[in-house]
Amino acid sequence: MALRVIRFSMLLLCVLAAALALAGSISASPSSEVDILHVDGDIVPAVSSYIDRGISHAEDHQAAAVIIELSTPGGLLSTTEKIVDRILDAKVPVVVYVDRWAGSAGTFITLAAHVAAMAPGSRIGAASPISTQGDLSETLQKKLTQDTAARIRSLADLRGRNEIAAEATVVEALSFTDQEALGLAPIPASDQQLLGLDSPYLSPPLVDLGAKDVDSLIAQLNGRTVNVAGEQVTINTEGYVKNDVGMSTIEKFLQAISNPDIAYVLLSLAVIALILEFIHPGAILPGVV
């Protein structure tokens, strides 16, 4: 009797172990979920935190891909570098979809993506670096421009995109429409001459895909193979489920107060509050504000 109990217990343990192993293999399988991030506005530290969190979330549940829907005039170079590095280190395919505008910093973020896509009527470029400390000396400005140009060339080379056009967005502050960036429309003759191109059509193109909306983009991603963390990964979006990953309340607040206009208003209010505190000491509220 005791022997039967022992055998039954061992059998039960084996069944449980097999079930756990099967569950682990199922959970480790890539899902058909596509995470969507929305970046609208300046590229500031709060946006970097948001993108990092979004990519980490996609990695945790092995999403088919994470799409960053982007519309930005630009932002801080240091923050842009962090976002670019996070995309390069990602363990899931990262797709940047230029919804309206990928200006300056947005150009780097777009070109860092495993897949770069643009919406009709959108634009990309004008990525020349500008110092927040005022005018730089000619030497320092040249160093900054050359370093930034090398960075964007390396990104274009890594993803097999047009290095000449990418560099021109930094050195010459050129911008391209979605059709020009896709190599489907001729660039202006003056730009063609400036770039030293034989053809007015960018070849290879600056971006990979054109899509009217996110659903159209996801359909085009299905079956596309990209290099993710040194491995060839085929994106499978068949039967996909979209998962919107929004900014947290804190991230929204930090992004809002990082806006130069809002920051100026807040600074002005702080100065007024300090003046009132000096005029009416002990009023408490102005000093606290």
Which sequence ranges carry the predicted segments?
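Soluble extramembrane regions of membrane proteins in the secretory/endomembrane system
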Residues: 24-254
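N-terminal secretory signal peptides that target proteins for export/translocation
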Residues: 1-5
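Generic hydrophobic-segment detector
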Residues: 14, 44, 48, 96, ...
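Bacterial N-terminal signal peptides
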Residues: 9-23
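Transmembrane alpha-helical segments that form the functional core of multipass membrane systems
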Residues: 247-289
